Amino acid sequence: MLSAILLIPAATGALAITGLRLRQRRRYRRLESQQRDWITQYGAAMDLPQALPEPVPDFQPRIAVLPQPLPTPAFDALREAALRCQHAERSYFPAHKQGGTVAYEDLHRLAPEIVAFYQSGYVRRLCSAVIGQPVAPTPIHDQSSCSLLFYDRPRDHIGWHYDHNFYNGRHFTVLLPLVNRHLKEDRLSSAQLLIRQDGHERAIPTPPNTLIVFEGARVFHKVTRLEANELRIVLSMTFCTHPQASLLKGALRRCKDVAYFGIRALWT
């Protein structure tokens, strides 16, 4: 009798989450339809180049840096869209991470230009050329597929880590710094992207309009602390050779996303 009573709240909770996930799937289908319109609308406004930058950097160390990958009008449009997003979700993990994030789903409402850029053929072709394999954006239900990382308070940072791969194919992180500056002095912020390879640490340059492509599951990396009167906003995008996932990997991804985007990640 007691066990039956205890099962009632569990079953109710499972049904509630299932209902929320079904409703969210319908919403995602609508957003995917909007994406196609945005690619046409904002892609034309940004006037992304047809030709890729040359030469393409070597990706053998699993990380590559491309300075100035975007024409000024396209970059300015992305930066202005990011600056409109003033309500990032803050997360704090003692001794590891502090900062703000604007999730992929929220960008559809707050900055559709950024969504159109992520889904553009130019970015996909550029990343594929750098990596040496065809890649595609990760799914719309993954809140980390395309997000803004806000470092806007002193001590914002993230410690040493790998990016978990929850997909069947190889998984890549692509960063585009949109703002990286001291607010009172003419210099970059104190926050630095560091990687550790073969027992050595090195800093990766992150001035605005620099594209950093790396295989996060293989490259150990961190971002050092921001100081007072500094601002760093980075567009983070993920691409994959095979963006499909098993049920187990999907469940693990949602659990991870709870730490960054709250309980709503469970029904994405």
Task: Indicate where each model-derived feature is located.
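Short N-terminal helix-initiation segments at or just after the protein's N-terminus
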Residues: 110-123, 138, 175-186, 250-260
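Residue-level detector of conserved, well-ordered beta-strand and adjacent loop positions
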Residues: 67, 224, 236
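Conserved beta-strand positions that form and line the central face of beta-propeller blades
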Residues: 65, 192, 222
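Fe(II)/2-oxoglutarate
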Residues: 1-59, 258-268
